Curated annotation (Swiss-Prot):
Compartment(s): Cytoplasm
Protein name: Adenine phosphoribosyltransferase
GO cellular component, one term: cytoplasm
Quaternary data: Homodimer.
Protein encoded by which gene: apt
Amino acid sequence: MPIKSRIRAIPDYPKKGIMFRDITTLIKDPVGFRLVIDNLTQRYLENGVDFDVIVGIEARGFIIGSALAYALGKGFVPVRKPGKLPADTVSQEYALEYGTDKIEIHIDALEKGARVLLVDDLLATGGTALAAAPLIEKVGGVVSEMAFIVNLPDIGGEEKILAKGYKVFSLTAFEGE
């Protein structure tokens, strides 16, 4: 059973008209979780994308990013919601469909010039990833690529990210679904 078929679809969540793609059914399955990490590991061992550290976006980016960092022998840096990191941070505000939100990273999280693989579970609008990228840059990092389990291309996030000059990789996509 491939990765895509292990992802549950929940209609009208979190609001009417939204088809929510729930990766919890994928990662609770040991074979599914292994497929995700093994496929990403293979890509980054063989693909030639150079990076020094993985940055994961709260919360599901932590699950995938930390397992991938372990598999590749890389470090892991969290990007978190405000007030969750104990040392000095920098923050970035970003737009939501119904307001704004903010994410933070420790100011000493990355070495100057560190090449970063930015990881999250799902790419929809691209808002969170496009907020995390300038955070990484503020603390001296360079985004080598952004990796996701799921891309929802009809929502347009991938186009926005590519337009900003970043590279994108996703394991699967739900186009027109």
